[in-house]
Amino acid sequence: MFAHSDPDHRAGCTHALDREPDAAAEHDRRAVSRGRAVAVAALLVSGCAATVLSGCAAPGAPAPPPAGTVVDYQLGGGYDPPAGVGGVVRDSTDEPAEGLYSVCYVNGFQTQPADREVWLDERPDLVLHRDGEPLIDENWPDELILDASTGGKRQRIAEELAATFDRCASAGFDAIEIDNLDSYTRSDGMLSQNDAVALASLYAEHAHADGLAIAQKNSAEFGERGRDEAGFDFAVAEECHRFDECELYTDVWGDHLLDIEYSDDLRGSFAEVCADPQVPSSTILRDRDLTTPDNPDYVFESC
């Protein structure tokens, strides 16, 4: 996920409502389409139903957030955004923000905590195993790493997630943020970056068929592969300034990059962060747990 040798240098915000991160994971980083009905109708008329297998795209390219848009990161629960915010990222179980560009968070390479037993009971072969035991993300032990090692398994995983994508589209979201692209770095060598790119391309295909843009989450080391091979439309980075990665992203994505810095681990003041010419204009500051405004720990600022 990042241009670092440490495989645990990664996002830490998957479903903040589900649980609090443990101490060891404190600094690990995880995370209303107007006209979508027309796009879906066009797909149906043309016979290109929005399935992973279809290979069909909705008329017109789904658009990323406009460059420079302030996008609030609300994975800890949706709330009325502060003044000046033009978009939000919310969990797939939440609703989009009316009148704002809304991104739907989906965990695409690991299981969600609430779904752990479903995957083990109903599709255990799609969960990566080591010595007969399911392989977990050690920093998020209630998440299992999905087995994207073969084309057949990738296809089935993508089909399982298709309903979530469809729900995001029907709810009125504009885009998908797909998390844990770097899960292969926690696979004990059983998965590769090529596997991740191949699965991501299936997700991008389905998102586009649903009329949704799709964002690469973190993984600066993917370079142009995320854009050119996987088919991502923009990127969401956590702490690109803190870890001196912003230029790695902007070299590929230009202004189509959203960055979230965290108040507990800034490199300098937030004013200094915003003054750095390498930092994208769509940069915000949030508290690590992505709390809502009624929580005393809540933090939100934008450049």
For the regions a language model picked out, list residue spans one by one.
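Glycan-processing catalytic domains of CAZymes
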Residues: 57-303
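Disulfide-bonded cysteine motifs in exported proteins
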Residues: 8, 43, 49-51, 269, ...
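Intrinsic disorder/low-complexity segments enriched in polar/small residues
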Residues: 21, 27-29, 178, 233
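Intrinsic-disorder-associated, low-complexity terminal segments enriched in Asp/Asn/His/Tyr and depleted
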Residues: 4-9, 18, 22, 28
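Residue-level detector of alpha-helix boundary/anchor positions
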Residues: 11-13, 17-18, 224
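Secretory targeting and sorting signals
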Residues: 13, 20, 30-59
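N-terminal targeting/docking segments
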Residues: 14-17, 51, 82, 238-239
